[in-house]
Amino acid sequence: MNKIKELTKSSFEITYELFIVMIPTLIVVKILDEIGFVEILNKMFAPLMFLLGLPEAISLVFTTSMLTSPYAGLIVFSGLPADMPFTAAQASVLGLLILFTHSLPIEVIICRKAGVRARAMIFIRLGLGILSCYFLNLFFELTGYMLSLIHI
């Protein structure tokens, strides 16, 4: 019984620490969205989408998942035009990009609390995410693998 009490107490302490980080971060992200910062990021990342073989419209999906969560990015993705040409290769590249960069502000703050430098974490996650997606896209283009259109 004592072990359950310790585990419960520890769980609440960890949850409290996460809420202290998550709630202010989400508020800041929402404020940045309201003042148009997300739109600036979308325009900034549009050329990157081209480099990764993705349509420009995907920059909104990328920015949303990077600043909030993969689920929010998928909601934005589901709102894209159904007639937008999209291949299985592009879906794979987008999925990999989201896996590397999702929830970046929250996770960087949590890593910083654990002793990891924020800049290093941002560089590693964004840099390796972009590099991995670039090479994955290059593989798909060179081999012609998974280039068939999919229906969103």
Task: Put a short name on every predicted segment.
Residues 85-140:
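Membrane-core helix-loop-helix motifs of multi-pass transport proteins
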Residues 25-36, 135-143:
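Structural signal for alpha-helical transmembrane segments and their membrane-water exit/capping regions
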Residues 21, 25-28, 38, 73-77, ...:
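Alpha-helical transmembrane segments of polytopic integral membrane proteins
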Residues 21, 25, 29, 42, ...:
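Alpha-helical transmembrane segments in multi-pass membrane proteins
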Residues 10-32:
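Core transmembrane alpha-helical segments of multi-pass membrane transporters/permeases
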Residues 42-100:
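Membrane-interfacial helix-loop connectors
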Residues 4-15, 37-52, 114:
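Hydrophobic alpha-helical segments of integral membrane proteins
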Residues 150-152:
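Conserved small/polar residues in nucleotide/adenosyl-binding loops
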